[in-house]
Regions:
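Conserved catalytic core of the tyrosine transesterase superfamily
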Residues: 1-314
Length: 314
């Protein structure tokens, strides 16, 4: 059996039992593009290693690819599609210390201001109000891209300013209050009436100019192009280019900074932020506390104030 057919059957199987299976499906399709349409049994360990480790570094992405391929080949072995797995059994230690791009206020202003001109080009399939509202939602509510693109019309209440996230990671649905500015932007962006029939859910909130659902890759490529057009680049000394998902990280970091500056008890506020972001564990939220120097500085200042107060009472 060819690799493409085996992947298609494997994805169909997992989705038929109720799994969304989006991440593994995307990784396996990337593997298919890397290898080409070859016989499943002809793929060697060297080919797999080249896909896993293009830059000779073991990263969290390496682990995700490894897991997806390992499960795929285990499935193939149990069904007699392949005799053995070419995926390396040993899992090296992760060497990546990834620091996301935390957007400054100026960068956010440039990105939002540049949307209208950028999306006015003839080849752009996403209308400017739609793309601007999507960026505002990702930053203003800290949503994951998949959560935003899966929103349906009935899940966004523009009257009360509430957004219901059903298609969430870890299947943790949550309701989020949003401010009037974001609510207004979403109202302006409501998907246009389709100009031609499309095989799509009729209640999709974000849609392209023809009424079709927005593909993840189209949105990502549009954002990369917007960053280049508006001069938003990686920080000096960083190899990581700004990403859409970094809007979510920026939301969390900016919220924590605001709490510190307002004198709030950040440790008591963390569970609320964790719930708002849809994190499975509060430890996932706590990592933001050490993500950028400004947060560490604010935490240090808070500790110094506390320590001096304790000394003064002795």
């Amino acid at each position: 059996m060819t690799l493409g057919n085996a992947i298609a059957r494997y994805v169909d199987f997992n989705q038929s039992v109720g799994m969304r299976f989006q991440v593994d499906a995307a990784l396996l399709k990337a593997f298919h593009r890397h290898v080409g349409e070859v016989d499943l049994a002809a793929i060697s360990p060297d080919v797999v290693v080249a896909f896993l480790q293009p830059r000779h570094r073991v990263t969290s992405t390496w682990l995700m690819k490894h897991r997806a391929l390992r499960r795929f080949y285990q499935h193939g072995i149990t069904r007699g599609l392949v005799a053995c797995s070419p995926v390396p059994a040993a899992i090296p230690r992760v060497t990546e210390t990834f620091v996301p791009h935390i957007y400054s206020d100026e960068e956010l202003r440039r990105l939002l201001a540049g949307v209208a001109t950028h999306q006015a080009r003839a080849r752009c399939t996403i209308a400017a109000p739609t793309f601007r509202a999507l960026l505002l939602l990702l930053y203003g509510a800290g949503l994951r891209l998949g959560e935003a693109l899966a929103l349906r019309r009935e899940e966004v209440d523009l009257r009360t300013g509430m957004v219901l996230i059903r298609q969430a990671k870890f299947y943790k649905a949550r309701s989020l209050p949003i401010g009037p500015t974001l609510t207004q932007a979403l109202a302006v962006s409501v998907a246009p009436t389709p100009t031609r029939p499309r095989a799509m859910p009729p209640t999709t909130f974000f849609a392209n100019r023809s009424g079709g659902a927005l593909p993840h890759q189209t949105v990502r490529h549009t954002f990369v192009s917007l960053c280049a057009r508006t001069g938003v680049y990686a920080r000096a000394g960083s190899t990581a280019a700004p990403r859409l998902h970094d809007l979510r990280h920026s939301f969390a970091v900016h919220r924590l900074l605001a709490w510190y500056r307002e004198g709030a008890d950040v440790q008591r506020c963390l569970p609320h932020l964790s719930t708002y972001l849809g994190h499975a564990r509060i430890a996932c939220t706590q990592r933001y506390l050490t993500m950028i120097p400004e947060l560490l500085e604010q935490a240090s200042l808070r500790f110094e104030t506390y320590a001096h107060g304790e000394v003064g009472h002795e």
